[in-house]
């Protein structure tokens, strides 16, 4: 009955918005090398994250974990706050 859960993605990013109730927006950065020119290309995307106790604030570095769909756009939940904004 108590089976092990499948591997869940864990990402780190910065909180860019905390104006919603129990939801934060986190900006995730992905760096990759251009296949021809070798330059490091930086691309970002913003995801909505479930924050049950409204703990995170703008500028915090957070760890988020993939979860089941919680709403139309929320598929991530707050795992931990790594570093508070100064």
Swiss-Prot record:
InterPro entries: NA-bd_OB-fold, Ribosomal_uS17, Ribosomal_uS17_bact/chlr, Ribosomal_uS17_CS. Signal peptide: none annotated. GO terms for cellular component: cytosolic small ribosomal subunit. One of its GO terms (biological process) is translation. Gene3D superfamilies: Nucleic acid-binding proteins. Keywords: Ribonucleoprotein, Ribosomal protein, RNA-binding, rRNA-binding. It comes from the Bacteria. Transmembrane segments: none annotated. GO terms for molecular function: rRNA binding; structural constituent of ribosome. One of the primary rRNA binding proteins, it binds specifically to the 5'-end of 16S ribosomal RNA. Part of the 30S ribosomal subunit. HAMAP family: Ribosomal_uS17_B. Belongs to the universal ribosomal protein uS17 family. This is Small ribosomal subunit protein uS17. It comes from Bifidobacterium adolescentis (strain ATCC 15703 / DSM 20083 / NCTC 11814 / E194a).
């Amino acid at each position: 009955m108590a089976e092990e859960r499948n591997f869940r993605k864990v990402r780190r990013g910065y909180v860019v918005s905390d104006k919603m109730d129990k939801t934060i927006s986190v900006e995730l950065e992905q760096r990759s090398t251009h296949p021809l020119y070798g330059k490091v290309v930086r691309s970002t995307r913003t995801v909505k994250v479930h924050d049950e106790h409204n703990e995170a604030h703008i500028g915090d570095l957070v760890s988020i974990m993939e979860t089941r769909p919680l709403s139309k756009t929320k598929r991530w939940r707050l795992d931990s706050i790594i570093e508070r904004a100064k």
